[in-house]
A protein has these predicted regions:
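Hydrophobic alpha-helical transmembrane segments
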Residues: 39, 43, 103-109, 320
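Internal/C-terminal transmembrane anchor helices
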Residues: 126-160
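Membrane-embedded alpha-helical segments of integral membrane proteins
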Residues: 68-120
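Cytoplasmic membrane-interface segments at the C-terminal ends of transmembrane helices
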Residues: 50-58, 109-132
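Non-catalytic, solvent-exposed segments at the cell envelope interface
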Residues: 154-523
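Juxtamembrane loop-transmembrane helix junctions in multi-pass integral membrane proteins
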Residues: 31, 54, 89-96, 131
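Acidic/Ser-Thr/Pro-Gly-rich, low-complexity N-terminal segments
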Residues: 1-26
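Hydrophobic, aromatic-rich membrane-embedded alpha-helical segments
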Residues: 30-59, 64
Length: 523
């Protein structure tokens, strides 16, 4: 016969109950489902507090401690300053880790919401209460997990963009780096100016792949590292006799510049042929084993020497075919159209365009139309020269209209388009400094000089390089003076760059692009 069981002693109060039993008794004592709902909401906003209230003190304390640590980390980043944030935000490892961390946080947060509600819910909840609780937990989980998942996707896309586009070896990027001492406050040291070669390359779907990239547009952006004052120098693609410095190995092969020695009109020796032709005619490692893009390196040296600026610090190649996707990702750009611009067409073969971009003020163009705005030349006066003028207006529009809110709202599309559109040798460890410099540029007015007949005695077949270099130095002084706030430098009239025909003023002063890209329709 079994021994009779003894009755367990009744606890004097709730404090003598185990945590789980105490929480269940409390909720059951309230007998009201709405308090479980209220504390589920509170526990969602402050993860762990719902568990604590339900009697899961240890679990609640751990979750609240982790949440507090995340809040403190966010406060630190918010007060650490832009330099620290951009340094972390341009680190592939940090972005990849953050992406994974956000996904883990989403899973843990959702689990805490569900666990908290189950612990808070009355022991004898009705079927309706269980369904209502499930809907509540699902809605709260969706509200928390969605932004975290989007953030994870954005940071992952950013990491992929950085890893694809920018140089992965900061110790030997192929660019020109300053040897002057640098600090966080002055990342450029004593380097007063950064020169970036911008190449608009045509390697699109309609071009034979065997022909390689054609440098359809060539500009040098010279930027003052202190003020952000910037000047774009545009050279015609048919420019001949691009020189090389005597201390460059290229001078041995082209002592008189990139020239066949006979005909300055030989298209195989034009500026736009350098990218493909020179690498095929020189030893592969002539410029160093570290150089990954010989064509771009050749142009950095040659164009920098031609303008008297020295070798460009970095290059940026923009694939014109992918340019459409990039502009579409930005949501389009707004430009003034001062005369009819053809969409397609071939003047030499008398093939008419398939359409026109009609004149108008503040016309919002998608990627396709923006590309033709920059490239159209069928029976346009000045042809290549007018096209060069419009190309700098496109660059100015992108710089001025790519606002942070626009970039953030379209970040995934921009990152995907950028990875397919842009090549550069800017190293990742220089990105924080470049971002800071870009923000300075955004707060200034871009200036520009297009080398064309009427500017510095320009002749494409035989450019007067000493006069060109003097004009470059004059333009830099004008931009620095205008942006330095000492005096305002009068800019060329809007008609100067908006019309296809160059004017006298274009040869005497650099143009402020906010003026030269204004609406001033051709008569």
């Amino acid at each position: 016969m079994s021994e009779p069981q003894r009755a367990l002693p009744t606890p004097a109060n709730d404090a003598d109950l185990p945590d789980a039993s105490r929480g269940a008794k409390r909720i059951g004592g309230h007998g009201r489902f709405r308090w479980a709902v209220v504390w589920t909401l509170i526990g969602t906003l402050i993860p762990g507090l719902g568990l604590w209230h339900a009697g899961r003190r240890v679990a609640g304390a751990v979750v609240m401690g982790l949440f507090a640590a995340l809040v403190l980390a966010g406060v630190y980043l918010g007060t650490a300053g832009r330099d620290r944030v951009t340094t972390l935000g341009t680190n592939v490892g940090v972005l990849s880790g953050l992406s994974i961390g956000l996904l883990v946080l989403a899973v843990v947060w959702v689990a805490v919401i569900a666990t908290s509600h189950l612990a808070l819910r009355p022991l004898r909840a009705s079927g309706a209460q269980r369904v209502t609780g499930g809907i509540l937990v699902g809605a709260l989980s969706l509200a928390i997990a969605t932004p975290l998942a989007v953030g994870a996707e954005y940071t992952w896309s950013g990491a992929q963009l950085l890893g694809t586009v920018f140089a992965d070896d900061p110790t030997d990027p192929g660019g020109t780096t300053s040897t002057d001492p640098t600090t966080a406050a002055n990342p450029w040291g004593a380097k007063e100016r950064i020169n970036v070669l911008v190449i608009g390359g045509d390697s699109g779907t309609n071009r034979d792949a065997s022909l390689g990239l054609r440098a359809d547009a060539v500009m040098m952006a010279s930027i003052d590292t202190r003020t952000g004052a910037s000047t774009l120098f545009s050279l015609p693609r048919q420019t001949a006799r691009i020189p090389f410095p005597q201390d460059s190995p290229l001078h041995k092969y082209y002592p008189n510049g990139f020239y066949d020695g006979v005909n300055g009109g030989n298209a195989e020796y034009f500026l736009n042929a350098m990218y493909n032709n020179i690498p095929s005619r020189i030893p592969k490692n002539l410029l160093g084993d570290h150089v990954k893009n010989v064509g771009a390196e050749v142009m950095k040296i040659g164009v920098g020497e031609a303008l008297g600026l020295g070798k460009a610090d970095y290059y940026v190649i923009i694939n014109m075919d992918g340019f459409k996707s990039f502009i579409n990702a930005l949501g389009g750009i707004t430009l003034n159209v001062n005369y009819r611009i053809p969409i397609g067409g071939k003047t030499t073969e008398n093939v008419p365009p398939i359409g026109w971009i009609e004149p108008g003020r503040d016309k919002h163009l998608n990627g396709r139309l923006a590309l033709w705005y920059a490239r159209g030349r069928y029976h346009v006066k000045g042809s290549d020269y007018s096209r060069m003028e419009r190309q700098r207006c496109v660059i100015n529009a992108v710089v001025q209209q790519a606002r942070p809110d626009v970039v953030l709202a379209n970040f995934e599309k921009i990152a995907a388009a950028g990875a397919k559109t842009i090549q550069t040798d800017i190293p990742r460890n220089k990105l924080p400094a470049m971002i800071d410099l870009a923000l300075k540029v955004k707060n200034t007015n871009l200036h520009s000089v297009v080398f064309q007949p009427g500017v510095a005695g320009w002749v494409s077949a035989n450019p007067p390089w000493p006069a060109v270099q003097r004009r470059v130095q004059q333009a830099l002084k004008e931009a620095d003076k205008a942006e330095g706030g000492k005096t305002s430098t009068p800019s060329a009239s809007a008609a100067t760059s908006s019309s296809a025909k160059p004017t006298k003023s274009s040869s005497s002063k650099s143009e402020d692009l906010s003026d030269s890209c204004a609406y001033n329709p051709a008569k």
